Amino acid sequence: MDPQINPAITATANSHDGPIETDAVIVGAGPVGLFQVFELGLLEIKAHIIDSLAYPGGQCIELYPDKPIYDIPAVPVCTGKELTDNLLKQIEPFGATFHLGQEVTLVNKRDDGRFDLETSKGTRFITKTIFIAGGVGSFQPRLLKVDGLDQFDGSQLHYRVRNPSAFAGKNLVIVGGGDSALDWTLNFVQDGPNKAESVILVHRRDGFKAAPASVAKMKELCDAYEMQFIVGQVTGFEATEGQLRSVKVTGGDGVTRVVPLDMLLVFFGLSPKLGPIAEWGLNIERKQVVVDTEKFETNVPGIFAVGDINVYPGKKKLILSGFHEAALAAFGAAPYIFPEKRIHLQYTTTSPKLHKVLGVETPVFD
């Protein structure tokens, strides 16, 4: 399931002694963080990437590696894993170094304008610029609060689907009313390698915060007796011999029903946690970092924020928007890296210089 990262990348990350001096540090290895490497690389700016996960890809890999994504330009459909793998391949020419499984714990500005940065594993950097591309920060799933249920977390209680095949042939209860709950419900009901034995969807009300087409399809499957939908909330459970056997679902009518299961999947969304980012002296609005829209720079010169972590008038949380932000942020950062150099806009279609950077031959047209 993990993305196809070159083992030499992580080996390089482990070979440093003392502070690492670099042009740029990118905090977050999701799609926007990875594309930030590409845009910086075109300007010959070297970058190191830090992520709290043990693998690149961010939410795409952690939350929906197998879900289809339809809004990437010129790519009619791809999964989160495919998008991550393609981005990793795209940035290979730039030799970015990954520092995975660690979080940034300290950022201080030096007298010379650069930044001291340290991670939870003690990795230290001296960098000219910082790019925060950490999605919604360090995100955690919102938990189903039923006393004692957490003992089954990771065995029969799941807040993420890492391996869909593990649920094939099982009796599933899925709790939630958003896109993730509906998408996985449809995935496990319909014919395919991951088809479950049975699926019961539980939501506290009859309304959903999901795509109308998904809701309509779910109701169609219920009418065909291929699955069941129950309006109610999980208020308890039954277990024997250390195994979760059923959940108790209390409906709006006050009646509690016992629902047998093999696996319980809960999709209540994410609880964003900015963590140490909140202590960097940045302007923060509703747990998002305020930026300008010229360079996507924060109120601290030299620190940029791209992707879902930032906020500005008209902000849309789309991967496409993050790619655009990464391009402008790279140009905005260039004067910090090359203060005496004038940066010219070049095109990968025609620039021999960029072709050399990318390691490709310049085409010759008749």
From Swiss-Prot:
Signal sequence segment: none
Keywords: FAD, Flavoprotein, NADP, Oxidoreductase
Annotated positions binding FAD: 51, 59, 64, 104, 139, 308, 349
Record-listed E.C. numbers: 1.18.1.2
Pfam families, alphabetized: Pyr_redox_2
UniProt cofactor note: Binds 1 FAD per subunit.
Reaction(s) catalysed by this chain's protein: 2 reduced [2Fe-2S]-[ferredoxin] + NADP(+) + H(+) = 2 oxidized [2Fe-2S]-[ferredoxin] + NADPH
Enzyme class: oxidoreductase
Gene Ontology molecular function: any one: flavin adenine dinucleotide binding
InterPro entries per UniProt: FAD/NAD-bd_sf, FAD/NAD-binding_dom, Fd--NADP_Rdtase_type_2, Ferredoxin-NADP_redctase_2
Cofactor dependence: FAD
PANTHER family tied to this protein: THIOREDOXIN REDUCTASE 1-RELATED-RELATED
Family classification: Belongs to the ferredoxin--NADP reductase type 2 family.
UniProt-listed HAMAP family: FENR2
Assembly mode: Homodimer.
Name of this chain's protein: Ferredoxin--NADP reductase
Organism ancestry: Bacteria, Pseudomonadati, Pseudomonadota, Betaproteobacteria, Burkholderiales
